[in-house]
């Protein structure tokens, strides 16, 4: 059995680790809230933009409009945009999205394509750069804001547009982690280009807030009710032609889709980190309890041994 000092040192170490994981859990919880706020703040613009596109769509057939972002040409090459985190300590978040990319990449190779990868996040960059012999990497992006902004999405969007408009890629897919609930998220594959605008569907979002109870910080959940979008008047007169309008609006729509994917991924990362740190805190608490029990047993055994030695010495 380990000596008392070793056990005592381990107990102190575990308790200190628990303080760190608990702090990281609370920080992640606060940042999840910020990430969700960012999504809600950007939604009015995205929703209005979708309404304008729907209005134009109701007047003309997109298929008849000469816009390069809507053109569906023969698919010869495909680009995959992969969004991961820059950091770890977030459970299986990075592993799950990388596995999804590998599966999709293998499917496309089996179909006869040679996909290019556009990587976002240090974890994806590090993983696939170590396997350059198996994966073709086109470009990389890292060190984005933890709560993504429009500026963060610009670089990724411009790279996607350059690939598609230069016909280096005939289709662009984005693979990111969709935020479902605080304890549930899932990697998804979405086609970005060619665009097929169908409007922005609002969901019954869950919002998480930090609260206090019995002098402890907790996280509570509430729901944001789905709002009814205001329809644009059907008699709006557009001065520009549909081609000119779409050439201006579709890149904005694409950038909004990229931003939404970045924001969902950020919220998922933070939620996974919060869950992972919560589990780590629980494990640390359980381990500390086990070590305390071991320490008490060792201490009791040492005291018993000393008593026996004293009694034995007296008998002599």
Curated annotation (Swiss-Prot):
* GO cellular component entries: plasma membrane-derived thylakoid membrane; proton-transporting ATP synthase complex
> What task does this protein carry out?
Produces ATP from ADP in the presence of a proton gradient across the membrane. The gamma chain is believed to be important in regulating ATPase activity and the flow of protons through the CF(0) complex.
Q: Transport as a keyword?
A: yes
* Major localization listed first in the record, in broad terms: membrane
Recite the UniProt keywords alphabetically: ATP synthesis, CF(1), Hydrogen ion transport, Ion transport, Membrane, Thylakoid, Transport
Q: List the disulfide bonds.
A: none
Its membrane topology is listed as: Peripheral membrane protein
Similarity comment: family membership: Belongs to the ATPase gamma chain family.
One example of the protein's molecular function in GO is: proton-transporting ATP synthase activity, rotational mechanism
Q: Tell me the protein's name.
A: ATP synthase gamma chain
List where in the cell it is found: Cellular thylakoid membrane
Instruction: Fetch the Pfam families from UniProt.
Output: ATP-synt
Subunit annotation: F-type ATPases have 2 components, CF(1) - the catalytic core - and CF(0) - the membrane proton channel. CF(1) has five subunits: alpha(3), beta(3), gamma(1), delta(1), epsilon(1). CF(0) has three main subunits: a, b and c.
The residue range of the signal peptide is none
The record's listing under NCBIfam families reads: ATPsyn_F1gamma, PRK05621.1-2
């Amino acid at each position: 059995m380990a000596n008392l000092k070793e056990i005592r040192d381990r107990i102190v170490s575990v308790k200190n680790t628990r303080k760190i994981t608990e702090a990281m859990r609370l920080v992640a919880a606060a940042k999840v809230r910020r990430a969700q706020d960012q999504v809600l703040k950007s939604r009015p613009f995205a929703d209005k933009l979708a309404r304008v596109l729907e209005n134009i769509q109701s007047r003309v057939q997109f298929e008849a409009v000469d816009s390069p972002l809507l053109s569906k040409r023969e698919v010869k090459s495909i680009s995959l945009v992969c969004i991961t985190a820059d950091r770890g300590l977030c459970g299986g978040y990075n592993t799950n999205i990388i596995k999804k990319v590998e599966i999709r990449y293998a499917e496309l190779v089996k179909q006869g394509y040679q996909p290019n990868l556009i990587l976002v996040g240090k974890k994806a960059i590090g993983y696939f750069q170590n396997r350059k012999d198996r994966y073709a990497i086109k470009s990389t992006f890292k060190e984005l804001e933890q709560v993504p902004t429009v500026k963060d999405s610009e670089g990724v969007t411009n790279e996607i547009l350059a690939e598609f408009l230069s016909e280096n890629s005939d289709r662009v897919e984005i693979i990111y982690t969709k935020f479902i609930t605080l304890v549930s998220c899932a990697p998804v594959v979405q086609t970005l280009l060619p665009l097929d605008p169908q409007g922005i569907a609002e969901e019954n979002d869950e919002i998480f807030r930090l609260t206090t109870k019995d002098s402890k910080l907790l996280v509570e959940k509430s729901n944001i009710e789905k709002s009814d979008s205001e329809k644009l008047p059907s008699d709006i007169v557009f001065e520009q032609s549909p081609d000119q309008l779409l050439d201006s609006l579709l890149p904005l729509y694409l950038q909004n889709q990229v931003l939404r994917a970045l924001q969902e991924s950020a919220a998922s990362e933070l939620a996974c980190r919060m869950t992972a740190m919560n589990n780590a805190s629980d494990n640390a608490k359980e381990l500390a309890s086990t070590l305390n029990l071991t320490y008490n047993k060792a201490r009791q055994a040492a005291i018993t041994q000393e008593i026996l030695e004293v009694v034995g010495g007296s008998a002599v």
